[in-house]
Each structure stands twice: as C-alpha cells, then as structure tokens.
C-alpha cells in the first residue's frame, strides 16, 4: 500500500510540473489580461505613481507640475464608484451630476480644468498611456492651467477598474498689463 501511495505521489509531482503556462486567448486573438488587483497595493503608492507619470509628461511639454488635492480626489472617488454602479464610463453621475457639480459638492474652490475616465483592467500607468493617445484626454492632462489633480478608482471583484482623474486650477489667472 505504501508503494502505491508513493507511486501516486510521484505521478502527481511529475504531472504538476507539466502544467503549461500558455495564456488564455480572448476572441480577438489577444491574451486575456490578468487582473491587476489594486487592493494589494497601498492607495498612496498608486496615486503617486500616476502623479509622477502625469508630471513627467507635463514637464516634457514645459507645463508646470500638478499636486494632489484631497477635494479633487474625493470628487473622483465618488464618480469612479458611480460609474461602476451605472456600468457605464461617462462624465455624468447617476443623479445627472456633472464634474462641476461634484466639485461644488466637495467644496473645491478652484476651477475645473477637466475630467478623464476609464473602464479597464489596466494599471494606472497603462491607463495614463491610453489617455495620452486620446486627443481630448491628452489636452486635459497637459493643460497649463491645471495645478491640482485628484485620482481615484473603484475595482470590481473580477478586476475591472473604473478610473477617474480630475484636474483643477486653484490659482487665479494673472493679468499682466504692459505699456
């Protein structure tokens, strides 16, 4: 009996080593993405990765850097969760709120520069790269008026991530008069 158990153990060990790591393919012929679970990463790390990425892109275009803003992040968090509830990536809340409405609700005293959103399984930097390929999103991210940023997300159990990034301008534009 011991020989049989030992033989079974050997067979199991050998076949376990034969498991192929061939990626599962989607209907479009591309590998099915492996979910990136944000719960395994500290939220501040994700926010600072995105902030660093945004600022590197802005500096490469001679735009000033932006800083994280808690009010903008609160507005982004509300919208990321709401997009998930609606199962729809768009700029209006389930209560018909606009990005401006959400900034008013969180008490942001600056001006909205823009909001960029995404429904994806991608990391924060992959999402930023995708946003940079979209003319409208790129224009918001690089807008020289922006000096503050809020970033938030909501992740579903299957790994789908709803990203929302809001850029704002806290400073009053300077008017220069020359003679």
How would you name each of these model-derived features?
Residues 1-16:
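Sec-dependent bacterial lipoprotein signal peptides
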Residues 12-36:
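Bacterial Sec signal peptide processing site at the extreme N-terminus
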Residues 26, 39, 175-176:
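Intrinsically disordered, low-complexity segments enriched in small/polar and acidic residues
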Residues 31-35, 40, 44, 48, ...:
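Well-structured core secondary-structure elements of compact alpha/beta domains
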Residues 38-100, 149:
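Short, well-ordered surface patches within globular domains
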């Amino acid at each position: 009996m011991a020989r049989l158990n030992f033989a079974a153990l050997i067979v199991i060990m050998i076949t376990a080593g034969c498991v192929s790591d061939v990626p599962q393919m989607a209907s479009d012929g591309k590998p099915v993405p492996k979910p990136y679970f944000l719960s395994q990463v500290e939220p501040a790390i994700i926010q600072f990765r995105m902030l660093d990425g945004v600022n590197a892109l802005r500096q490469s275009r001679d735009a000033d850097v932006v800083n994280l803003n808690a009010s903008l992040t609160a507005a982004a968090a509300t919208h990321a969760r709401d997009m998930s509830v609606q199962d729809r990536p768009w700029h209006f809340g389930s209560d018909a709120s606009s990005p401006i409405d959400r900034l008013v609700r969180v008490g942001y005293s600056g001006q909205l520069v823009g909001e960029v959103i995404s429904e994806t399984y991608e990391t924060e930097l992959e999402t930023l790269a995708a946003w940079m390929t979209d003319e409208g999103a790129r224009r918001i991210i690089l807008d020289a008026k922006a000096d503050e940023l809020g970033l938030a997300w909501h992740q579903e159990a299957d790994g789908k991530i709803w990203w929302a990034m809001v850029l704002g301008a806290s400073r009053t534009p300077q008017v220069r008069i020359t003679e």
